[in-house]
């Protein structure tokens, strides 16, 4: 692994560690967006959220439904951002 890749990996790991317990938005490859409190994340990008809302891709502000706890499989996660 090059120095640049190593630096990027440590920054990504640090970012993910710092947002646990905070509100996040998780975009899936299917186009769905989930917004909730990040409870946990693992090395495979599997994500557990609490107090979660699900939104349509075409209108991120349009609430589809509200869920308490949601588990998202890492292979489906496009990105995670702090809300």
Swiss-Prot record:
Q: Which organism is it from?
A: Vanderwaltozyma polyspora (strain ATCC 22028 / DSM 70294 / BCRC 21397 / CBS 2163 / NBRC 10782 / NRRL Y-8283 / UCD 57-17)
What single Pfam family name could you report for this chain, choosing any that match? LSM
- What keywords are assigned to this protein? Cytoplasm, mRNA processing, mRNA splicing, Nucleus, Ribonucleoprotein, RNA-binding, rRNA processing, Spliceosome, tRNA processing
What functional role does this protein have? Component of LSm protein complexes, which are involved in RNA processing and may function in a chaperone-like manner, facilitating the efficient association of RNA processing factors with their substrates. Component of the cytoplasmic LSM1-LSM7 complex, which is thought to be involved in mRNA degradation by activating the decapping step in the 5'-to-3' mRNA decay pathway. Component of the nuclear LSM2-LSM8 complex, which is involved in splicing of nuclear mRNAs.
Biological process GO terms, please? Answer: deadenylation-dependent decapping of nuclear-transcribed mRNA; maturation of SSU-rRNA; mRNA splicing, via spliceosome; tRNA processing
State the GO CC annotations.
Answer: Lsm1-7-Pat1 complex; nucleolus; P-body; sno(s)RNA-containing ribonucleoprotein complex; spliceosomal complex; U4/U6 x U5 tri-snRNP complex; U6 snRNP
UniProt-listed SUPFAM superfamilies: Sm-like ribonucleoproteins
Q: How does it assemble?
A: Component of the heptameric LSM1-LSM7 complex, which consists of LSM1, LSM2, LSM3, LSM4, LSM5, LSM6 and LSM7. Component of the heptameric LSM2-LSM8 complex, which consists of LSM2, LSM3, LSM4, LSM5, LSM6, LSM7 and LSM8. The LSm subunits form a seven-membered ring structure with a doughnut shape.
Q: Know the name of this protein?
A: U6 snRNA-associated Sm-like protein LSm6
Q: Domain Sm, which positions?
A: 11-83
The UniProt entry, under InterPro entries, shows: Lsm6/sSmF, LSM_dom_sf, Sm, Sm_dom_euk/arc
Q: Report the subcellular localization.
A: Cytoplasm; Nucleus
Which family is it part of? Answer: Belongs to the snRNP Sm proteins family. SmF/LSm6 subfamily.
Primary location recorded for the protein, binned into one broad class: cytoplasm
Q: Which gene encodes it?
A: LSM6
List GO molecular-function terms, semicolon-separated: RNA binding
């Amino acid at each position: 692994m090059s120095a640049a890749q190593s630096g990027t990996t440590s920054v990504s790991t640090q970012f993910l560690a710092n947002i646990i317990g905070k509100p996040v938005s998780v975009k899936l490859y299917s186009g769905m967006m989930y917004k909730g409190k990040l409870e946990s994340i693992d090395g495979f990008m599997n994500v557990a959220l609490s107090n979660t809302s699900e939104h349509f891709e075409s209108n991120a502000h349009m609430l589809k439904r509200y869920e308490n706890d949601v588990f998202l499989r890492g292979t489906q996660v496009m990105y995670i951002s702090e809300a």
